Amino acid sequence: MRLPEVKDPVVYFSNEFALDSELPTYVGGLGILAGDFINEAAFEHFPAIGVGILYKGKNYIQHITGDGKEEKRDSEFDHDTSFLRLTTINGKELIIKLPTPTGEISVKVYHLRLSDTTIVFFLSTDIDTNPDEWRHDMDTIYGGDNDSQIRQQILLGVGGTKLIKELGINPKVYHLNEGRAAFCIWELVILYMKDGAMKFDEAWQKAKENIVYTNHTLVDAGNPNYTIDTVKYWAKPYADQIGIDCGMLLRDGDFFNDFSITKYALNISRKQSAVSRVHGDYARKKYPDYNWVAITNGVFLRRWQDSDFRNDTITDEELWNIHRLKKHELMETVIKRTGFGYDDNKLVITWARRLADYKQPKAILKDIDRLIEIVSNSSHPVQILYAGNSHAADMGSKALIEEVIHIFSTKLSSHAIFIPNYNIALANHLTSGSDVWLNTPKGNLEACGTSGMKAISNGVLNCTVLDGWTYEVDWEGVGWTLNPESVADDFYSLLENEMAPCYYDRTNGLPLKWIKRMRKSIEIAEGFSAKRMLEEYKKYLYSQN
């Protein structure tokens, strides 16, 4: 394998990478963000090396049965016959060895080259000689017990660091995209003590100076804790290599007598970043003793924005015709995925993201009768689209999906459709072919959110509860905002009195007021691009200042 010609790259660890709809290495926004970051780095020829895990995609594909139940089916992605390449050195397959309490584990490596400066490596323990539990860890992202999660984290952090060493790469910085790669510090300390003849405290400090950390959520479910004894069991082989007590490796994760991976990541990094300004404010309050910088997430516009919308000289008629084409393409996609169609001349409102209680997918379903009255107005008809996957660790999200589907297939059967298997391909159609992008989270729980950024880049108007990135936009004359305490009532009122009338108000066939809002949305999008995010990473996170 020929390495990219990079000097002092950033090594970007992420538990998820969304690079292709068929590649089962992501389940939500964390993976989408990682994919956008690494694609932007490649486009900008910024030296970056991604490190992730090659999951097999068990229970990866969402299927809705005829009676409205959610089923999960296994991915048919075959990494050995795919666009991924097996990583070799001098023609020989590269195998990394991981110490464990029961013996060494073998790790094979695949890669995907994105540019002359950027490559993503995927680690896998799905090897015949490994114990069954290590092989099953590759089944899915968040599906295992605590021991399985810790093994995945050791694979990502320690295995990834060993890989970088094996390839002879000298990183400028190790960037932890969420805390699950934090055990990288174990291997860094071992390297510094053995190769640099440092004492433990000196090696620990040097490792810390080379690590930065991005937190993506303050919600408890995204910040797992483990028993100290469980983590000690897995840490012992690494402590033994350098002749120290396990407690020395784990002390920075102590959190009320448990081990907090988030607290650990905070303590082993020299800088910490939040993913929006408001998230930064809350992070500083919750964890005040750290070097927080707020860098709002961004999206890789060349992946999400239709190229025609980058034309500054586009006329109103041309813009609207492109939008109508995108609406038609979305409608065809919906028919292909569900068997149900709709009139794509209708005002199309979309809610699409991972289904979780705090994202409030049922918010607009509070008063079904009133909603039906509004969307069935013959002069201002409205089509509602929903999409989203449940989370393996959240059984309540499966029940949410099935409840929404039941309502859509009964009371709202002529006006709402749930589209299964929300992935990159579907997201591209939804964020370009909808008219309104609906966002209804409980206040102060959405760290950033990026789906609305994709939408505005294509002139899809936002209707949102202010949270995460949406606090950073003046929505007057651009989109609409909802009070988190009265989401349903606000939505009904805005839809009936502002959104639908604006959309259907035509001059020579064109909704000029709507198009004006579309243009303003597109103008805003550049400020929420991955290009801007990468520049801020370089300036505020990767620099030694």
Predicted regions and their residues:
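Catalytic cores of carbohydrate-active enzymes across secretory and cytosolic contexts
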Residues: 1-545
